[in-house]
Amino acid sequence: EMNALRGIVKDGAGTTLYNYFTEFGLAQISVDFLLGTAGTLVQSKVREVLRAIEDNLLGESMTDVHALVSREFFDKLIAHPKTEEAYKFYAATGAQPLRQDVRRNFPFAGIVFEEYAGTVTLSTKATERLVPANEGIAFPLGTMDTFTTYGGPANLLEAANTLGLPLYARQHLDEKGRW
């Protein structure tokens, strides 16, 4: 599901099998927040992300925007001069950023930023970060069909013309079809 947010399909070794943006002829929208530059207007970058998502809803509606960001991105975001005050006064909402770990939820200018450090172990025994360093993935919440999962019937004779299930389990049959 994380790779679906990124628009790619990978195999167990981490090799990209499909890039949905190239497969469907879409342009991936990327916004450089320039968090290393003190003069960057971070709110304007956030609005750029929000407008890009709103412009591409294709008739859908949304309630919120959530962003899963890398550790490095989150650290730069909360240390940036344009967001530091907002993070410090985040305590007005009940959070205590000077005393508590609030990496799970920092709303700023219309996006809820969440530090996400998920990894996956590949078949090569190496690990791969699901959100690359200094990057993030923003997506809409509260839509009707954006994150719907569809399943089809298994490739089994007894599953033909049936509704798909999330998981199929069965014992291995011998060559004559016996258990």
Outline where the language-model segments fall:
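Short, glycine/acidic-rich hinge or "gate" loops at secondary-structure transitions
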Residues: E1-L17
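Glycine-centered secondary-structure boundary/capping sites
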Residues: G7, G25, L57-S61, G110, ...
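Intrinsically disordered/low-complexity terminal segments and short unstructured peptides
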Residues: G14-T15, G36, G118, S123
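Extended, solvent-exposed, turn-rich assembly/linker loops in the middle of proteins
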Residues: T16-Q96
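Sequence/fold signature of self-assembling virion shell proteins
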Residues: E85-W179
